[in-house]
Protein backbone atom coordinates (compact mmCIF):
# COMPACT_ATOMS: atom_id res chain seq x y z
CA UNK A 1 0.00 0.00 0.00
CA UNK A 2 1.33 3.47 -0.87
CA UNK A 3 2.06 6.09 1.77
CA UNK A 4 -1.00 8.28 2.12
CA UNK A 5 0.94 11.29 3.41
CA UNK A 6 0.51 13.95 0.75
CA UNK A 7 2.03 17.10 2.23
CA UNK A 8 4.48 18.69 -0.22
CA UNK A 9 6.67 19.90 2.63
CA UNK A 10 6.81 18.29 6.05
CA UNK A 11 6.71 20.85 8.87
CA UNK A 12 7.97 19.32 12.08
CA UNK A 13 10.23 20.67 14.85
CA UNK A 14 13.91 19.74 14.75
CA UNK A 15 13.48 18.03 18.10
CA UNK A 16 10.95 15.67 16.49
CA UNK A 17 13.19 14.65 13.58
CA UNK A 18 13.47 11.08 14.87
CA UNK A 19 9.75 10.70 15.54
CA UNK A 20 7.23 8.85 13.41
CA UNK A 21 5.43 11.57 11.43
CA UNK A 22 1.70 10.92 11.18
CA UNK A 23 -0.42 13.41 9.23
CA UNK A 24 -3.58 14.55 10.98
CA UNK A 25 -4.19 17.88 9.30
CA UNK A 26 -2.43 20.20 6.89
CA UNK A 27 -2.01 23.95 7.16
CA UNK A 28 -3.33 26.18 9.93
CA UNK A 29 -6.95 26.69 10.93
CA UNK A 30 -6.17 30.30 11.91
CA UNK A 31 -4.02 31.29 8.93
CA UNK A 32 -4.00 35.04 9.62
CA UNK A 33 -0.51 35.77 10.99
CA UNK A 34 1.04 38.56 8.93
CA UNK A 35 4.41 36.82 8.66
CA UNK A 36 3.25 33.29 7.87
CA UNK A 37 2.99 31.67 4.45
CA UNK A 38 0.37 29.20 5.72
CA UNK A 39 -2.20 31.92 5.14
CA UNK A 40 -1.89 31.12 1.44
CA UNK A 41 -2.50 27.39 1.94
CA UNK A 42 -5.77 25.52 2.21
CA UNK A 43 -6.46 24.11 5.66
CA UNK A 44 -7.28 20.41 5.47
CA UNK A 45 -8.36 17.91 8.13
CA UNK A 46 -7.67 14.35 7.06
CA UNK A 47 -10.52 11.87 7.65
CA UNK A 48 -10.00 9.48 10.53
CA UNK A 49 -10.11 6.45 8.25
CA UNK A 50 -7.38 8.06 6.15
CA UNK A 51 -5.25 8.61 9.27
CA UNK A 52 -5.85 5.01 10.36
CA UNK A 53 -4.70 3.61 7.02
CA UNK A 54 -1.64 5.83 7.05
CA UNK A 55 -0.81 4.67 10.58
CA UNK A 56 -1.00 1.07 9.39
CA UNK A 57 1.41 1.86 6.57
CA UNK A 58 3.89 3.69 8.80
CA UNK A 59 3.76 0.95 11.44
CA UNK A 60 5.36 -1.47 9.01
CA UNK A 61 8.48 0.69 8.74
CA UNK A 62 8.71 2.52 12.06
CA UNK A 63 11.10 0.09 13.73
CA UNK A 64 11.80 0.78 17.39
CA UNK A 65 10.95 4.47 17.37
CA UNK A 66 9.46 5.58 20.65
CA UNK A 67 7.70 8.81 19.67
CA UNK A 68 5.06 10.02 17.21
CA UNK A 69 4.57 13.57 15.99
CA UNK A 70 1.14 14.45 14.66
CA UNK A 71 1.62 16.64 11.60
CA UNK A 72 -0.49 19.76 11.14
CA UNK A 73 0.22 23.31 12.25
CA UNK A 74 -2.39 23.34 15.02
CA UNK A 75 -4.08 19.96 15.15
CA UNK A 76 -5.01 20.56 18.78
CA UNK A 77 -7.82 22.76 17.42
CA UNK A 78 -9.59 19.59 16.27
CA UNK A 79 -12.43 18.24 18.44
CA UNK A 80 -11.11 16.32 21.42
CA UNK A 81 -12.97 13.17 20.36
CA UNK A 82 -11.21 13.32 16.98
CA UNK A 83 -7.76 13.61 18.58
CA UNK A 84 -8.53 10.81 21.04
CA UNK A 85 -9.36 8.55 18.11
CA UNK A 86 -6.01 9.38 16.51
CA UNK A 87 -4.26 8.60 19.79
CA UNK A 88 -6.10 5.26 19.86
CA UNK A 89 -4.60 4.48 16.45
CA UNK A 90 -1.16 5.36 17.78
CA UNK A 91 -1.60 2.96 20.69
CA UNK A 92 -2.88 0.23 18.40
CA UNK A 93 -0.28 0.45 15.63
CA UNK A 94 2.79 1.75 17.47
CA UNK A 95 2.90 -0.24 20.73
CA UNK A 96 6.49 0.84 21.46
CA UNK A 97 5.67 4.54 21.31
CA UNK A 98 5.90 6.28 24.68
CA UNK A 99 5.32 9.89 23.66
CA UNK A 100 3.09 11.77 21.23
CA UNK A 101 3.74 15.39 20.29
CA UNK A 102 1.98 17.97 18.16
CA UNK A 103 1.85 21.66 17.27
CA UNK A 104 -0.68 23.88 19.02
CA UNK A 105 -1.71 27.49 19.16
CA UNK A 106 -2.18 28.94 22.62
CA UNK A 107 -5.87 29.59 22.02
CA UNK A 108 -6.35 25.90 21.15
CA UNK A 109 -5.06 25.02 24.61
CA UNK A 110 -7.22 27.65 26.31
CA UNK A 111 -10.30 26.47 24.42
CA UNK A 112 -10.06 22.97 25.86
CA UNK A 113 -11.09 22.22 29.41
CA UNK A 114 -8.65 20.75 31.90
CA UNK A 115 -10.64 17.52 31.70
CA UNK A 116 -10.17 17.38 27.93
CA UNK A 117 -6.44 18.07 28.20
CA UNK A 118 -6.14 15.46 30.94
CA UNK A 119 -7.84 12.89 28.71
CA UNK A 120 -5.44 13.65 25.87
CA UNK A 121 -2.51 13.31 28.26
CA UNK A 122 -3.81 10.00 29.58
CA UNK A 123 -4.12 8.72 26.00
CA UNK A 124 -0.47 9.49 25.27
CA UNK A 125 -0.14 13.18 24.41
CA UNK A 126 3.00 14.35 26.17
CA UNK A 127 4.46 17.29 24.26
CA UNK A 128 3.16 20.44 22.60
CA UNK A 129 5.13 22.79 20.36
CA UNK A 130 3.80 26.34 20.61
CA UNK A 131 4.73 29.56 18.83
CA UNK A 132 5.11 32.48 21.21
CA UNK A 133 7.01 34.46 18.55
CA UNK A 134 6.92 37.60 20.73
CA UNK A 135 5.92 38.52 24.26
CA UNK A 136 5.02 42.05 23.21
CA UNK A 137 1.35 42.75 22.65
CA UNK A 138 2.37 45.53 20.25
CA UNK A 139 4.29 43.05 18.10
CA UNK A 140 1.60 40.38 18.39
CA UNK A 141 -1.01 42.90 17.25
CA UNK A 142 1.18 44.14 14.39
CA UNK A 143 1.61 40.56 13.21
CA UNK A 144 -2.08 39.72 13.72
CA UNK A 145 -1.12 36.75 15.88
CA UNK A 146 -4.64 36.55 17.29
CA UNK A 147 -3.65 36.20 20.93
CA UNK A 148 -2.23 38.35 23.71
CA UNK A 149 0.79 37.66 25.87
CA UNK A 150 -1.44 37.12 28.91
CA UNK A 151 -3.54 34.56 27.02
CA UNK A 152 -0.33 32.80 26.04
CA UNK A 153 0.71 32.62 29.69
CA UNK A 154 -2.71 31.20 30.57
CA UNK A 155 -2.11 28.36 28.11
CA UNK A 156 1.37 27.60 29.46
CA UNK A 157 0.17 27.62 33.05
CA UNK A 158 -2.59 25.16 32.15
CA UNK A 159 0.03 22.82 30.69
CA UNK A 160 2.21 23.25 33.78
CA UNK A 161 -0.68 22.26 36.04
CA UNK A 162 -1.25 19.11 33.97
CA UNK A 163 2.45 18.17 33.79
CA UNK A 164 2.43 18.42 30.00
CA UNK A 165 5.76 19.33 28.44
CA UNK A 166 5.97 22.17 25.94
CA UNK A 167 8.52 23.69 23.57
CA UNK A 168 8.35 27.33 22.52
CA UNK A 169 9.48 29.26 19.45
CA UNK A 170 10.39 32.92 19.23
CA UNK A 171 11.25 34.92 16.12
CA UNK A 172 14.21 37.26 16.06
CA UNK A 173 13.54 40.65 14.50
CA UNK A 174 9.77 40.20 14.46
CA UNK A 175 9.24 43.73 15.74
CA UNK A 176 11.37 45.29 13.03
CA UNK A 177 13.45 48.34 13.90
CA UNK A 178 10.63 50.27 15.53
CA UNK A 179 9.60 47.59 18.04
CA UNK A 180 12.93 45.80 18.48
CA UNK A 181 13.54 46.93 22.06
CA UNK A 182 10.05 46.13 23.33
CA UNK A 183 10.11 42.82 21.44
CA UNK A 184 13.21 41.71 23.37
CA UNK A 185 12.09 43.08 26.73
CA UNK A 186 8.59 41.62 26.70
CA UNK A 187 9.58 38.30 25.13
CA UNK A 188 12.13 37.70 27.88
CA UNK A 189 9.57 38.77 30.48
CA UNK A 190 7.02 36.23 29.24
CA UNK A 191 9.54 33.42 28.80
CA UNK A 192 10.74 33.90 32.38
CA UNK A 193 7.19 33.21 33.56
CA UNK A 194 7.01 29.86 31.77
CA UNK A 195 8.70 26.47 32.15
CA UNK A 196 9.51 25.34 28.60
CA UNK A 197 11.54 22.25 27.82
CA UNK A 198 13.15 24.20 25.00
CA UNK A 199 13.18 27.53 23.20
CA UNK A 200 13.90 27.61 19.50
CA UNK A 201 14.77 31.06 18.21
CA UNK A 202 13.67 31.22 14.58
CA UNK A 203 14.85 33.49 11.80
CA UNK A 204 12.30 35.91 10.40
CA UNK A 205 11.77 35.18 6.73
CA UNK A 206 9.46 37.55 4.89
CA UNK A 207 7.49 35.36 2.54
CA UNK A 208 6.14 36.77 -0.72
CA UNK A 209 2.42 37.50 -0.91
CA UNK A 210 2.01 37.90 2.85
CA UNK A 211 0.76 40.94 4.77
CA UNK A 212 4.27 41.40 6.20
CA UNK A 213 5.74 41.53 2.70
CA UNK A 214 3.20 44.24 1.87
CA UNK A 215 4.11 46.13 5.04
CA UNK A 216 7.78 46.07 4.09
CA UNK A 217 7.02 47.22 0.55
CA UNK A 218 5.08 50.21 1.93
CA UNK A 219 7.89 51.07 4.32
CA UNK A 220 5.74 50.25 7.35
CA UNK A 221 8.12 47.49 8.47
CA UNK A 222 11.89 47.96 8.42
CA UNK A 223 13.66 44.62 8.59
CA UNK A 224 16.66 44.12 10.86
CA UNK A 225 20.01 43.09 9.43
CA UNK A 226 21.43 39.68 10.47
CA UNK A 227 23.83 41.46 12.85
CA UNK A 228 21.00 43.48 14.39
CA UNK A 229 19.04 40.25 14.91
CA UNK A 230 22.08 38.71 16.62
CA UNK A 231 22.44 41.73 18.93
CA UNK A 232 18.73 41.45 19.72
CA UNK A 233 19.06 37.75 20.47
CA UNK A 234 22.10 38.31 22.66
CA UNK A 235 20.05 40.73 24.76
CA UNK A 236 17.16 38.27 24.94
CA UNK A 237 19.41 35.45 26.13
CA UNK A 238 21.04 37.70 28.73
CA UNK A 239 17.60 38.46 30.18
CA UNK A 240 16.51 34.80 30.48
CA UNK A 241 16.49 33.15 33.91
CA UNK A 242 15.28 29.64 33.13
CA UNK A 243 16.21 26.22 34.45
CA UNK A 244 16.28 22.89 32.61
CA UNK A 245 15.60 24.55 29.27
CA UNK A 246 17.37 23.86 25.97
CA UNK A 247 18.00 27.02 23.93
CA UNK A 248 18.67 26.71 20.21
CA UNK A 249 19.19 28.95 17.20
CA UNK A 250 20.31 27.36 13.94
CA UNK A 251 20.40 30.57 11.87
CA UNK A 252 22.85 32.91 13.63
CA UNK A 253 24.15 35.36 10.99
CA UNK A 254 22.72 32.89 8.47
CA UNK A 255 25.68 30.55 9.00
CA UNK A 256 26.13 29.50 12.64
CA UNK A 257 24.29 27.38 15.18
CA UNK A 258 24.23 28.27 18.85
CA UNK A 259 22.65 25.89 21.32
CA UNK A 260 22.96 24.84 24.92
CA UNK A 261 21.12 24.11 28.14
CA UNK A 262 20.03 26.89 30.44
CA UNK A 263 21.30 27.97 32.82
CA UNK A 264 24.61 26.08 32.56
CA UNK A 265 25.52 27.09 28.99
CA UNK A 266 24.14 30.63 29.14
CA UNK A 267 27.48 32.37 29.67
CA UNK A 268 29.25 30.36 26.97
CA UNK A 269 26.48 31.04 24.44
CA UNK A 270 26.58 34.76 25.22
CA UNK A 271 30.37 34.71 24.88
CA UNK A 272 30.06 33.06 21.45
CA UNK A 273 27.58 35.74 20.39
CA UNK A 274 29.89 38.47 21.67
CA UNK A 275 32.73 37.10 19.55
CA UNK A 276 30.51 37.13 16.48
CA UNK A 277 29.36 40.67 17.21
CA UNK A 278 33.01 41.70 17.52
CA UNK A 279 33.72 40.16 14.13
CA UNK A 280 35.56 37.09 15.38
CA UNK A 281 34.76 33.43 14.72
CA UNK A 282 32.65 31.70 17.37
Question: What does each of the following model-derived ranges do?
Answer:
Residues 7-50:
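Canonical Radical SAM [4Fe-4S] cluster-binding loop centered on the CxxxCxxC motif
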Residues 28, 36, 51, 70, ...:
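Conserved, mostly hydrophobic/aromatic
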Residues 60-161, 165, 241:
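Conserved SAM/AdoMet-binding glycine-rich loop
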Residues 74-76, 106-108, 134-136, 172-176, ...:
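Active-site-proximal loop/turn and secondary-structure-junction residues that shape catalytic pockets
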Residues 92, 117-126, 185-200, 268-282:
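Structural recognition of alpha->loop->beta junctions
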Residues 136-142, 211, 256-258:
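A short acidic, helix-capping loop that chelates divalent metal ions and anchors anionic groups
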Residues 150-211, 226-249:
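Conserved C-terminal portion of the radical SAM core fold
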Residues 212-213, 217-282:
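C-terminal accessory regions of radical SAM enzymes
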